[in-house]
């Protein structure tokens, strides 16, 4: 989820978070809540929960002329729900806040195939990988660290240092 947020917003410059492990009391979080702001002032919010008792994948993107909602993941477990994208567009006729929406359902997962094709092409053609680079992974892990670090209680409890 964080890698998608970075894809849409770039790097986040400000992070506020609340991390808890009150349910199981293990040294890993039960719930993480993060608010992140990028240099343009765009705000992203993440809730990762192990106590929601249902797998969910929802990414809502609010735009000046509409919105995009991503739901579900086509996974082997089928536990994240139906994968679909809903696109809402503001129109001149819809002054009451309602938008024209279109929903597309995805029934086939081609992501692994597409990623392998891109990776193999980069090797064969000696070109850089375009998406999902090791640097992307590193920057996403830095963001994960920043989320844990920005919660004073969590940081002190687990002695997290820069």
PLM region descriptions:
Residues 1-21, 34-42:
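Oxidoreductase and adenylate-handling cofactor-binding alpha/beta cores
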Residues 1-2, 113-117, 141-144:
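A general structural signal for well-ordered alpha-helical segments in protein cores
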Residues 2, 28-32, 134, 141:
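Conserved glycosyltransferase catalytic-site signature
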Residues 5, 102, 127:
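Short, flexible active-site loop motifs that bind/organize anionic cofactors or intermediates
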Residues 39, 119-162:
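C-terminal helix-rich "cap/oligomerization" subdomain common to oxidoreductases
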Residues 10-17, 43, 66, 128, ...:
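Generic structural signal for secondary-structure transition and capping sites
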Residues 24-29, 39-115, 130-133:
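NAD(P)-dinucleotide binding in Rossmann-like oxidoreductases
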């Amino acid at each position: 989820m964080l890698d998608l947020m970075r894809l849409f917003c770039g790097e986040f410059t400000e992070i506020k978070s609340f991390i808890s492990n009150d349910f199981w009391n293990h040294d890993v979080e039960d719930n993480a809540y993060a608010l992140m702001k990028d240099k343009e002032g765009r705000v992203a919010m993440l809730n990762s929960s192990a106590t929601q008792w249902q797998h969910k994948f929802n990414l809502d993107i609010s735009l000046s002329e509409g919105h995009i909602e991503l739901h579900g993941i086509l996974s082997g477990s089928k536990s994240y729900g139906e994968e679909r994208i809903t696109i809402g567009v503001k129109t001149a006729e819809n002054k009451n806040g309602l938008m024209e929406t279109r929903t597309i359902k995805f029934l086939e997962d081609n992501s692994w195939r597409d990623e392998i094709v891109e990776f193999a092409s980069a090797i064969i053609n000696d070109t850089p990988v375009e998406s999902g680079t090791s640097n992307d992974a590193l920057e996403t892990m830095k963001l994960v660290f920043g989320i844990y670090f920005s919660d004073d209680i969590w940081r002190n409890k687990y002695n997290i240092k820069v």
